């Protein structure tokens, strides 16, 4: 986060690329996010409360969420934020979350809102290369999700759960069924890491620690947005600035290992050492492909780890299995 705050953000700004906070938006940009919330986000958001009538909401692994501290309004005096309308040059209404020192514990509630993964984390704003985080948009208009309540504090957070599989092959007669059961159960594994912003309200932090059963050493307070993986997508969203981009890297494929050559003949003559990503993995795919269709190959034995759903390796292994290998 030191690199993010002291290098990445300033360097982006020098090149007129901005990740803006709500407080820095002009009227046109603010009206844009208001409409974006109403039209795109609000229909898919599901606020979940924690009270005596229901258990603490389940927080799935690696999901981004917004924790909310609420208090019921006795005399609501304003409409939900999302109903505000910008007309002409009228000043944009920007509701502020007011701190309260006289909080009554009986009236204070905890709620959480999951940030939908179907939308990009970065939202493009009007203006050249201006962006805002989707969780900032949701936070700005939370009052529309909780009518009749006052928002006292908010904070984005993310949990990482123990996703290890623990299957003892010698103790089960049906390994496939045991693995399937473990895959379902690991989604509810214990929380190994809780990430929150360093500015989080103490009450919210205590609620998360207590209800997620997290130890203090598993709590990570970060100086910036929770989950910086959105930066991976930024380069593809920025217009222009080709001078700032790395040239595309093309891995090397040895001609002796392509499909136009018999790879078995090539490796009889010499050994080939490949290092990914510098060497093209297609050489391995070609090798398995040729082994699958070569009638002199009796069996293929290999170790696979986390293959994709459309893996060509799986395709050719299936082809080999159909031929009795």
Predicted regions and their residues:
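N-terminal localization/anchoring segments of enzymes in phospholipid and broader phosphate metabolism
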Residues: 1-325
